[in-house]
Structure formats: structure tokens, C-alpha cells
Amino acid sequence: MAGATVPTVTTGGRPLRKSFVAAAAVVLIAGLGAVSTATADPPHNPGGPCIQPDQNVSLSSVAGYADVVQALDRIERTSKGLVSVSSAGTSGEGRELLYATVGDGPTTFWLHARIHGNELHSTEAVLQILDHLASGDPRARLIREQLTVIVIPMYNPDGAEANIRQSTTPNRIDLNRDWENFVQPESVAFWKLWRETAPELALDLHHMGEAPVVNGTNDLNQFQIGARSIAPSRMTAEQWLTNRQMAMVSVDALDRYGLANIAHYPLIDITNAALSRMLMGGTAPAGETPVTQSLTKGAIFYEVRSVGQKSNGQLERLFTIPTMAVLTAAADGTLGSYDVSGYDALPFATQGPCGE
């Protein structure tokens, strides 16, 4: 949601608690689609919507840090031992950097959300996915048997509480540009968790900060697939193939859903992003030894359109549907043979500031 003007909410550390009112967490999972503030749709071109500087935006239906603590506690307690919740460390403001582990399969899958604190709906989507992975659904059982899934619902809790993109203290920086210098405690903690868990596959959930249209159309682009956070020349052949396979599994799942108007994310080469260094290796926090490039074989990201309020549920499904598809393909073995011939034909989108 970069570039959008949104209100700042009050920050404040909350201690990690081990028991909560379960009903509140149920509301968190089931009710984030509710609208608490009614406002007219802002102007947009075409199709919007876009947040305007003077627009009243309610964050009451968006998962905050306390909601994440509560939801993870509920899921862990009701999972009958299938889910364990741990802390990778503490944020700059002292919040626990919480993650959940579900499954005990031989392949580790890393899933993180909200590395940018003001990209709101990925947290709720990840909590829904975790809740489902702890269920008796046959697909969930298969994933648990074949994968060990590391789930990080809120990578940047301080930024999320402040409703800003960056971290807050001791440095206000983009945490998705900190896997070379590691100046923030969040980056150090999650790098160590990545090294410890050695995920073969990784997925990072984001929101767009603009309202693009699919090239050659007037269709609002609602989902962008990011198969390359770095140039393919920086990846191994296996990594580049796996990234495209993960991308096409995601795209095909959303095509069946409809209305996503999918496009490529712009071609970038950002070496200090978290996923980039998962693929490349070669960097480490002070006092640590860098790992080799071969640790992670595939790492991609999603960009979903921003602004919920009247469409929270749809935005969350744009995350949950492709994520579950990739998890399933990784678990049932189809990912490794998935056809990537349609990847190059995916359109790009024309970026445009909201409301202009």
C-alpha cells in the first residue's frame, strides 16, 4: 500500500500471553469481512478503488498485533498438537516475532506476510490458511504429511501497529531491503529462523500501492505474480524453473476463481530483499556465517490490490486461493513437473497513481 495516505494508529507493546478469550479469535477469523465505517467510494481511473488523502479509512476490521497473538493462541490450543507457536525474537519495540509451525513433512515451506506494515490483508489471509492446515480436510492432511510449513502472519509488528510500511525503531527502514545489512532486529531474527529451518520453498504476501490496469485493457489489475525478485541470471536453473512453476500454479488457481485480472509484477532485480537473499545466500548478520545459494529452491511473491473496507473477503481470497494451490502442488508432487509454457505470455500492467 505504498503511496497511500492512511491514518496512523496508536502503537504500544503487548506482552505475549498464553491464554485468551477464544471467542474473540473466532471473530477475528470469521469476521474480518465486516465493514465498520461507511464511506463513499473515492474517485478512481479506471475501476479503483483508491484511498484518497481525505478519505476516512477504518482499521477496526484489520488484524492487529493483539489479534495475531490471540488467533495464534487459539489455533495452537485447538489444533490438538498439530500447530506449535514460537517466537523468533523481538521487534525493535519489544514485540514477539511470532511464527507457527504445522506439519512434519520432509520439505519445509516458508510463508510470511506483512513485511510491510501497512499492507493490511495478508495477515488475516495467512491466519485463515494456518487454521485450515490444522483441520481434518484431506488436502490439509496431505500438506501436513509432506510439508513442514513455517507461517509468519506479521513479519513487521511494529510497522503494522503504526500502520506504516517500514519498521519503527531503532531504524525506520524497509525490512524488505534489509537482508544485506541486517540493521533491524526483525531481519536478524528471521534470517536466523530461515537458516535454522532451511526452507526449500518460500512465499511472501504483499499489496500493491497503486491501481494499475492490465496492458491493452481497461481492466483493474487485482493480482500480480512476482516470480523474480532478482534477475534470473542470479538464480540457478532449478530456482528459476521452480519460481515459474510456483507462479503458474498460482495463476491457474486464480484463473479458475475468476475476476483477478492477473499480470506480471514489473521486472526487478533487488538483491537486498528477503526472498532474494533466500535464493542467493551470501549475506548474514554480524557474527554469523552466510549460507550457500542452494538452500532455497523457489521463492516468489504475490501483490494483491489494496483497499479493503468493502471487499476484505475478496482480497483475502486473492491470497488464500493461490497459496493453498502452491502448498498442495508442493505436497502432492505436481509442482516439480508443472507446465510453465504460459509464463512468458502473461501480460504486464500499466502502473498508475490512485485517482489519477
Where are these regions (language model features)?
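Secretory targeting and sorting signals
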Residues: 1-41
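C-terminal accessory segments enriched in acidic
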Residues: 18-21, 41-63, 196-199, 215-356
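Short glycine- and acidic-rich boundary segments immediately preceding or forming the N-terminal edge
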Residues: 41-93
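Solvent-exposed, polar/charged alpha-helical surfaces in well-ordered, non-transmembrane soluble domains
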Residues: 70-73, 124-131, 188, 192, ...
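Surface-exposed patches in mature extracellular/periplasmic domains of secreted proteins
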Residues: 84-89, 138-146, 259-267, 338-339
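A short loop-to-beta-strand scaffold at the N-terminal edge of the catalytic core in hydrolase folds
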Residues: 93-100
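Short glycine/proline-enriched loop/turn "hinge" motifs that connect secondary-structure elements
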Residues: 101-103, 165-168, 290-296
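Active-site/substrate-binding loop(s) of hydrolase catalytic cores
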Residues: 106-115, 120-245
